[in-house]
C-alpha cells in the first residue's frame, strides 16, 4: 500500500519567492499577488527565508490558516503593515504561509506552529526554523511596526550589517567637519538627515531611517539624542525633530518638528476636497442578504441544512491535521483529550438521517465510525487509559499513519477533494472548516440526546467536556480557542449551565449564539450567511430564545435531517 506523499521525502525543487509569486497549493489564501506580502509554500520557504547571500533581508512570516477567524480578521492589518514598511524591504520583508494547505504541513510543523496566527521574525541569514523569534499579533499598525523595528535593531546590534542603516546614535562632535566625515561613508549622498530624539528607547528615528532607504544614494540618515551638541546650536526644543543639511553647509535646508510635519499633513488632508461617499453603497452585500431573507424566506431557508460532507470533511481535518500540527507527541492531557474526542465521535456521530417519517442510513458516516473505533482502540493499546499516561509518548507521525491505514481499510469514507456543501462560503475564504466543526458538535449533541433521552440519570457533561478538551489541546485558531474556553469555563460555564440531559444540545446552541453575537458585523461575517441568533425567523418563525419548548424540537429535527454524502463508499480493505 502506498501512503500519501505526506510521509515521503520532498522532491519539490527549491525556489525563491518574491512579491507577486503565487504559492503552490489548493487552499484559498488570505493574501493576493497584489499585496506586499511574499506568499511562501513548501517549495520556496527554505530558499527564501534561509538565504545565505550577503544582501538577503530578514523576514517576518505569518503562519496562518485560511479557515481561522482570527487570521481573517488579522489579514487586513498584516497587509497594511506590509504596505507601510515596504520601503524597508532591503532590511526586512513580510511573508506568509497557509498552514491549512496540506502541501505546507511539514514546514509549519518544523516551525512549531502551535496556533494561528503564528508570527516569527527570522534574522538575516537565518539557517533553520529555530533561529526565528516568536512575535505577537498586535491589533494596531503602530504596535506591529514597533515590534518589527525592535527586532531589526536587535539584529543590527549583533551583526552590524554595512548595507543597513546605521542605527547608532550620532557621537558628540564639536565641528561641522566632523559631521561631514559621517557622510563620507556614502560618497553619492549630497545631504544628511538627522532625527533628534528624546529618549534612547524611541523608535521614531530608526523607522524614519528605514523609510528613507530608497533615497540612500541622495540622503544619508542618522539619529541623535536630545543632549547632542547640535541641539543647542540649532535651538531645538521639541522632540523628535528632523534636520537636513546639504553637504558642506552649516545652515540646515530643512528643520522641523516631526509633530508639526504630521500636523501639516493632517491639515492638508482636511482641506482637500473629498468625494462624498454614498452611504447606501456601504455594507450593500449584508443589507441585500438581510432583505432577501425577509422578503424571500424560503429562498434563504434552502441554504440552511446539515450536510454529511461538511461534517466528515471537518472531522478528518480535525483528527488528521490539527492533532499533528505542531509535531508534539501525544502524551498526558492531550492524549486523554484525543481519546475522549474519538470516543465521542464513535459513540455519537449520526449514522442515520431522519427526514419526516423517512429514515436512511448514512453509509459514509457508518464507515467513518469504524475508523474512530480503530483509532480509539489503537490509542488504548498504546496506554491512553493508563493512570500515568504522562509517561506514554506516541508520535503524531505514527498516529497519522495508523489513521490513514484505518481510513483505507474502511473504504475511504471521508471526502477530501469534494467542496464544502452548506459550509461553502460566498468566497473561498469564508466559512469552511469552522462551520463544519460547529455543525459536527451540534449533530453529536443531538444524537447523544436521542440515544439516551429516556435515561433520566444521563449526564450532559461527558460529551460537552470531550469537545472542550479537544478544542483546548488541538484547535488551531488561538483567538477562537481562548474565547471558547473562557466562555465554557467562566462566562457561561458548562458545569453550571448544563444540568439536565437535554442541555447536552441546548447548551451548545446557547453557546454558539453567544459566539454569533460577538462576531456579528465583523469583516469575517459571510454576507450570504449572516450571524443570526439561531434559528433565524425564516427557519423557525415561532422560535424565541426564551421559549425552549419550541427551540428543542426544532434543533432535534434540524440536526437529525442530514443531507447524505451520496458518493458510494469504496470496498473496505479488511487487511490491517
Residue positions per predicted region:
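Non-globular targeting/processing and membrane-anchoring segments
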Residues: 15-30, 156-454, 474, 508
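Cleavable N-terminal signal peptides of Sec/SRP-targeted secreted and luminal proteins
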Residues: 1-15
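Local sequence-structure signature of Cys/Sec-based thiol-disulfide redox active-site neighborhoods
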Residues: 25, 44-85, 175-211, 460, ...
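N-terminal leader/targeting and pre-domain segments
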Residues: 12-58, 88, 97, 109, ...
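A short, hydrophobic beta-strand/beta-hairpin element that forms part of a small beta-sheet core
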Residues: 59, 78, 114-134, 232-260, ...
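Alpha-helical bundle/repeat cores within regulatory domains of eukaryotic proteins
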Residues: 443-564
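Short, low-complexity cationic-aromatic patches
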Residues: 49-54, 69-70, 74, 85-90, ...
Amino acid at each position: 500500500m502506498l501512503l500519501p506523499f505526506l510521509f515521503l521525502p520532498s522532491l519539490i525543487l527549491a525556489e525563491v519567492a518574491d512579491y507577486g509569486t503565487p504559492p503552490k497549493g489548493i487552499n484559498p489564501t488570505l493574501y493576493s499577488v497584489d499585496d506586499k506580502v511574499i506568499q511562501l509554500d513548501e517549495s520556496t520557504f527554505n530558499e527564501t527565508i534561509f538565504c545565505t547571500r550577503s544582501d538577503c533581508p530578514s523576514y517576518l512570516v505569518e503562519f496562518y490558516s485560511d479557515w481561522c477567524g482570527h487570521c481573517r480578521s488579522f489579514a487586513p492589518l498584516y497587509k497594511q503593515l506590509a504596505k507601510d514598511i515596504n520601503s524597508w524591504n532591503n532590511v526586512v520583508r513580510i511573508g506568509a504561509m497557509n498552514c491549512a494547505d496540506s502541501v505546507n504541513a511539514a514546514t509549519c510543523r518544523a516551525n512549531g506552529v502551535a496556533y494561528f496566527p503564528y508570527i516569527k521574525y527570522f534574522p538575516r541569514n537565518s539557517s533553520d526554523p529555530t533561529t526565528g523569534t516568536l512575535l505577537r499579533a498586535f491589533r494596531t499598525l503602530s504596535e506591529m511596526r514597533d515590534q518589527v523595528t525592535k527586532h531589526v535593531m536587535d539584529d543590527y546590534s549583533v551583526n552590524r550589517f554595512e548595507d543597513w542603516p546605521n542605527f547608532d546614535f550620532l557621537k558628540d562632535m564639536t565641528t561641522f567637519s566632523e559631521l561631514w566625515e559621517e557622510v563620507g561613508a556614502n560618497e553619492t549622498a549630497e545631504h544628511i538627515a538627522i532625527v533628534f530624539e528624546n529618549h534612547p528607547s524611541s523608535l521614531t528615528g530608526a523607522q524614519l531611517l528605514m523609510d528613507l532607504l530608497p533615497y540612500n544614494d541622495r540622503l544619508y540618515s542618522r539619529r541623535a539624542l536630545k543632549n547632542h551638541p547640535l541641539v543647542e546650536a540649532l535651538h531645538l526644543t521639541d522632540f523628535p525633530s528632523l534636520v537636513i543639511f546639504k553637504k558642506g553647509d552649516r545652515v540646515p535646508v530643512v528643520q522641523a518638528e516631526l509633530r508639526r510635519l504630521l500636523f501639516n499633513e493632517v491639515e492638508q488632508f482636511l482641506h482637500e476636497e473629498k468625494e462624498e461617499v454614498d452611504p447606501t453603497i456601504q455594507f450593500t452585500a449584508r443589507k441585500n442578504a438581510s432583505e432577501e431573507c425577509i422578503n424571500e424566506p424560503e429562498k434563504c431557508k434552502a441554504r440552511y441544512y446539515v450536510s454529511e460532507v461538511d461534517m466528515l470533511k471537518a472531522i478528518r481535518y480535525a483528527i488528521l491535521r490539527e492533532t499533528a500540527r505542531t509535531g508534539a507527541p501525544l502524551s498526558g492531557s492531550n492524549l486523554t483529550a484525543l481519546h475522549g474526542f474519538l470516543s465521542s465521535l464513535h459513540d455519537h456521530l449520526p449514522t442515520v438521517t431522519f427526514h419526516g417519517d423517512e429514515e436512511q442510513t448514512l453509509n459514509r458516516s457508518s464507515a467513518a465510525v469504524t475508523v474512530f473505533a480503530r483509532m480509539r482502540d489503537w490509542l488504548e493499546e498504546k496506554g491512553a487509559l493508563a493512570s500515568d499516561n504522562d509517561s506514554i509518548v506516541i508520535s503524531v507521525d505514527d498516529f497519522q499513519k495508523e489513521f490513514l491505514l484505518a481510513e483505507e481499510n474502511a473504504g475511504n469514507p471521508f471526502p477530501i477533494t469534494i467542496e464544502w456543501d452548506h459550509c461553502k462560503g460566498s468566497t473561498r475564504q469564508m466559512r469552511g472548516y469552522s462551520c463544519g466543526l460547529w455543525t459536527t458538535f451540534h449533530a453529536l449533541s443531538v444524537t447523544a440526546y436521542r440515544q439516551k433521552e429516556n435515561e433520566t440519570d444521563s449526564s450532559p457533561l461527558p460529551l460537552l467536556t470531550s469537545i472542550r478538551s479537544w478544542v483546548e489541546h488541538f484547535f488551531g485558531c488561538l483567538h477562537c480557542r481562548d474565547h471558547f474556553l473562557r466562555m465554557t469555563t467562566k462566562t457561561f460555564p458548562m458545569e453550571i449551565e448544563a444540568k439536565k440531559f437535554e442541555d447536552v444540545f441546548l447548551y451548545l446552541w446557547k453557546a454558539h449564539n453567544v459566539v454569533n453575537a460577538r462576531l456579528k458585523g465583523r469583516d469575517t461575517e459571510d454576507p450570504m450567511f449572516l450571524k443570526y441568533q439561531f434559528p433565524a425567523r425564516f427557519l423557525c418563525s415561532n422560535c424565541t430564545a426564551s421559549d425552549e419548548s419550541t427551540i428543542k424540537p426544532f434543533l432535534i429535527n434540524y440536526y437529525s435531517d442530514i443531507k447524505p454524502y451520496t458518493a458510494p463508499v469504496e470496498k473496505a480493505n479488511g487487511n490491517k
